[in-house]
Amino acid sequence: AGFGTGLNAFLTLLHSEGSGKKIQYTSIEKYPLDPAIVKSLNYPLLSGDAGSNFFNAIHEAPWEKQFNITGDFSLLKIKADLTDYIPDGAYDLIYFDAFGPGKQPEMWTPQIFDTIASVTVKDGIFVTYSARGEVKRNLIRTGFKVSLLPGPPGKRQFIRAVKC
């Protein structure tokens, strides 16, 4: 949830490239970034020419349509409000990249976690930068086993939860 800058999609594509795994990446974003902001991002510089091509392809992919970035990586970008969106299908991994509960409380309600749990496969993984108690409790309530992992610079911890 939250396509944002496309960083999670980009890193997933880079990491999966050459693995032989088929990735169907779906992202929901209410406010897509302006193309000028996307062009100013330096993410492609971290990965060479191939990475730059992938990054551009991710951002140039149409909205509301499944699009093959590579033979093994397809992307579906959905322009929608997660609070109104009813996902279909089942997901192995969910990057929950919303702003924290203090800034976007509507994204952290029990109903959102009920929806997440209903579309996550058994042993599916949910990750988020928020490590607040209410987030952990909602994940546990909806059938996840929660672990706290060391966070990136400036963030003490983040959550990795596995659906039981």
Task: Cite the ranges covered by each PLM segment.
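SAM cofactor-binding core of SAM-dependent methyltransferases
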Residues: A1-H59
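Short beta->alpha hinge that forms the Motif I/post-I loop of the SAM-binding pocket
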Residues: K30, W108, A131
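S-adenosyl-L-methionine
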Residues: I37-D88
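A short SAM/SAH-binding and catalytic strip from SAM-dependent methyltransferases
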Residues: D92-M107
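Conserved beta-strand signature within the Rossmann-like core of class I S-adenosyl-L-methionine
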Residues: L93-Y95, K122-S130
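A short glycine-rich, Lys/Arg-flanked "PGG" loop and its adjoining helix->strand segment in the class I
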Residues: E106-D123
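Class I S-adenosyl-L-methionine
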Residues: R132-C164
